[in-house]
Amino acid sequence: MITTKELRNKFINYFESKNHSHQPSSSLIPFGDDTLLFTNAGMVQFKDVFLGIEKKDFSRAVTVQKCLRAGGKHNDLDNVGYTARHHTFFEMLGNFSFGDYFKKEAISFAWEFLTKEIKLPVEKLWVTIYASDDEAFDVWHKHIGLAKERIIRIDSSDNFWSMGDTGPCGPCTEIFYDHGEDVAGGLPGTPEQDGDRYIEIWNIVFMQYNRHADGSTTDLPKPSVDTGMGLERISAVLQNVHSNYEIDLFQALIKKAQQVTHAKDINSPSLKVIADHIRACAFLIADGVLPANEGRGYVLRRIIRRAIRHGNKVGAKEIFFYKLVAELVSQMGEVYSQLIDKRELIEKTLIKEEELFLKTIENGIKIFDAEIENLKDNTISGEVAFKLYDTYGFPFDLTADMAREKGLKVDEQAFLAQMQIQKQRSKEAGKFNVDYNSLINSQVKSEFRGYSTLIEDAKVLEIYQDGQLVASTSEQVSAVVVLDKTPFYAESGGQVGDKGILEGIGFEFVVEDVQKSGEAILHIGKLVKGHLNLNDELTARVSDKPRLATAANHSATHLLHKALKLVLGGHAEQKGSLVDENRLRFDFTHDKAISRSKIEQIELLVNQQIRANYPVTTIETSQQKAKSLGAEALFGEKYGDIVRVISMGDFSIELCGGTHVAYTGDIGLFKVTSEGSIASGVRRIEAVTADKAIRHTFTNENKIIAIKDSLKANDTNLIDKIKSMLEQIKNQEKQIAKLKKELLSGSSNDIKETNIGDIKVVVANVDGVDVKTLRNKIDDYKSKNTKVIAVLTTTNADKVQFVIGVSNALTTLIKAGDIAKELSSHIDGKGGGRADMAQGGGNNSANIDQALSQVEKFILNNIKE
């Protein structure tokens, strides 16, 4: 039996023998592409190559790509573990041609690999083609020799692929494997095609058209090929099993899942869920995603919680999920070294999230209890059930069981409708939704000279206006200029683009921003004088002060990154950065606020390196050599085969394409201005350097001097004076609260109380008190009366605030939230709450007496009924 590991290597070796360049898997996070949540196919890392935006030094590639389709092909997470082939995480085997070979070679390679390399029986293979793709039919029938009846024409979107609403697209051919007559299912294109007998194992996409905004298509100048074959699927075929979960890799994980959960049934779907989800979670965390309440972190959190729920379902009595990481590292760590490097972070993250989920369950139950108190009938809405599912991780059946215990039911159809809305959003989020034809797609190459000079003589190669190539541009017109060589740095790696001037005989162009398009550097700005034409010669001048200030901030981020790792730990990895002339911003992984003492340690460490005045050295070398030198590769960056390594003494060494100071001493001074959270597990530090750091220090000193002057204090007694003042304020606030309470008590004689049988009704407006005092008075009424309905308001200018209390014994007659709605309607306000307590406010105090009169009638009418 061929193992998954052997098959992975065999695929790579075969295509390397066909002159394909083996490229490593890209991250699960498609950086620089906001149209996609996760990398979900092998072609994602080559998207800009297919579009002609990015150039590579190879025209053929082979990859084994990490992919995530949070819930499988249709983003249906709940199918994972219950079907034979749904996964969250999977590996995609792929070979690619960028304007090199096309249909004949692509089909031939696939057929040879399947029938010769891994020796699949020809009689087990079927293929589909796009209905009108006669060229593909001829290759299969005439060149490969496949019988006509084994080539199925499909006239649907299943055999036509597009990158988005516009851009590259084309037909595809799919290869299917027949698992045999003992498995249910029919051929592709038949009503029984969704069965498990005929399984798609390889999809070959022929990108030969460009789709325009009006729906029309034109031929691409260089047709390309994109293929994908799921490693897990083809492994199942070769290991003679009908389910992906029966292959060697999954069996090892399932056995470990059974061990740590103490599950009795090894065939439980829950163990498959856990085995699948540990791969998705571990690789997401290794690629820099941490659990959060939105975006990618939210998807990770849901996957973790689903695994935990299934573990509890089969018998887990303690935290267990992290215990599968060791087995995953054993199975896949040799191929994906980041699992080894990030093992500690993965395990700690899973432990913390499982502990958090246990608390979340408790919170969800509280929400459930609060919702059923406000029910008007015996049905919990689908919206509430979905909220419990989506926010608190409650599966529908758990909500239904809890409802059943209280004699209630749940609107399942409304819940499913909410689920469908979410699935549609996820499906749409997985598409490329950009009109690629509107992008500037320059095919020229600009040489960057800005590492060594800020002034360069150059020639105009291209001019764009409104995205269109033009021959010239006029005064006061915004345009984009491409030069043959330039000292201007284009925005990348978190560093903003340069500013400056392009000037020649009779013209001047102000550069406001600089971006990249493929190998072209785009100078974005406005012609403020004269006319600019193609082939004009000019002098490009970068504004030196912004560039030097930006360089100081960029070099400081390298020192900061290293200092964070030394002070906080190796887990403090960069998640993002912004470097301009005014400041630096650095985002990194850390799960709690940084204490003032640690910030001081970080600042001292960075400033020590600045005072050491280390030379900042640069070398260009291979990625492999750079890694051997210990260079830090930054999260989310794309690197070429040859990389630029920036060293600052022996303190910091990173891969970086940005601009830097010559010596660390040129940074001058480093000062942190803020530190805070931007997402769960992600912190942000903002800082300034050089003159701005000095000015920041002056500003803070001046504030302290002003405070000392106001308090008539000095350096020795300032802190004590502030503490004394705060204590006085605290005591005065207590006295004020006491006086307000006495004021309210004194007003009690004026508060109207009505008795309806054994029910006391209190409705009154009390001036000069706050909401807290009203709430305390409401609690006082409820503690002294078993049946009371109290409505208290207070006014300030035109504003109204109110608190409403209803004894628990009366909530079946009337609810505090309903009274709040009635009162709000008379004072231009809003309010709400639980059945026994509500509060709110309004903007019309003029009608308060009339409003309270109406509320009293509302209460009396309800309790008399």
Swiss-Prot record:
Pfam families: DHHA1 (PF02272), tRNA-synt_2c (PF01411), tRNA_SAD (PF07973). Its EC number is 6.1.1.7. Transmembrane segments: none annotated. GO terms for biological process: alanyl-tRNA aminoacylation; negative regulation of DNA-templated transcription. It is found in: Cytoplasm. CDD domains: AlaRS_core. Consists of three domains; the N-terminal catalytic domain, the editing domain and the C-terminal C-Ala domain. The editing domain removes incorrectly charged amino acids, while the C-Ala domain, along with tRNA(Ala), serves as a bridge to cooperatively bring together the editing and aminoacylation centers thus stimulating deacylation of misacylated tRNAs. HAMAP family: Ala_tRNA_synth_B. This is Alanine--tRNA ligase.
